[in-house]
From Swiss-Prot:
GO terms for cellular component: extracellular region; membrane; other organism cell membrane. The keyword RNA-binding does not apply. Residues 1-22 form the signal peptide. It comes from Androctonus mauritanicus. This is Mauriporin. One of its GO terms (biological process) is defense response to bacterium. ZXR-1 and ZXR-2 are two shortened peptides derived from mauriporin. ZXR-1 sequence consists of the 16 N-terminal residues (FKIGGFIKKLWRSKLA), while ZXR-2 has the additional residue difference K36L (FKIGGFIKKLWRSLLA). Both peptides display distinct anticancer modes of action. ZXR-1 could translocate into cells, target on the mitochondria and induce cell apoptosis, while ZXR-2 directly targets on the cell membranes and causes membrane lysis. The variance in their acting mechanisms might be due to the different amphipathicity and positive charge distribution. It is found in: Secreted; Target cell membrane. Amphipathic peptide that displays potent antimicrobial activities against a range of Gram-positive and Gram-negative planktonic bacteria with MIC values in the range 5 uM to 10 uM. In more details, it is active on Listeria ivanovii (MIC=5 uM), Staphylococcus epidermidis (MIC=10 uM), Salmonella enterica (MIC=5 uM), Pseudomonas aeruginosa (ATCC 27853) (MIC=5 uM), Acinetobacter baumannii (MIC=5 uM), Klebsiella pneumoniae (MIC=5 uM), Escherichia coli (MIC=7.5 uM), Salmonella typhimurium (MIC=7.5 uM), Pseudomonas aeruginosa (ATCC 9027) (MIC=10 uM). Keywords: Antibiotic, Antimicrobial, Cleavage on pair of basic residues, Membrane, Secreted, Signal, Target cell membrane, Target membrane, Toxin.
C-alpha cells in the first residue's frame, strides 16, 4: 500500500476510536429522554396522573382494573 492509503486508514481509525471513546451512558440516556417516544409516554403519564388526581379530589368512585380480554397475537 502506498503512504496516502495508509494515512487515510490511520485517520479513519482514529475517528472511529474517538467516537467509541466519547460514547457515554449519560449522553445515551439524555438522547432517550428527549426522543419522541419518551415525550409521548411522559405526556400520556401526566394525563393519566391528572385524571386520577381529579377522581381522588372529586371523590369519584374508584374503578376496578378491568381484566383484559384475550390478547390477539
Amino acid at each position: 500500500m502506498n503512504k496516502k492509503t495508509l494515512l487515510v486508514i490511520f485517520f479513519i481509525t482514529m475517528l472511529i476510536v474517538d467516537e467509541v471513546n466519547s460514547f457515554k451512558i449519560g449522553g445515551f440516556i439524555k438522547k432517550l429522554w428527549r426522543s419522541k417516544l419518551a415525550k409521548k409516554l411522559r405526556a400520556k403519564g401526566r394525563e393519566l396522573l391528572k385524571d386520577y388526581a381529579n377522581r381522588v379530589i372529586n371523590g369519584g368512585p374508584e374503578e376496578e382494573a378491568a381484566v383484559p380480554a384475550e390478547r390477539r397475537r
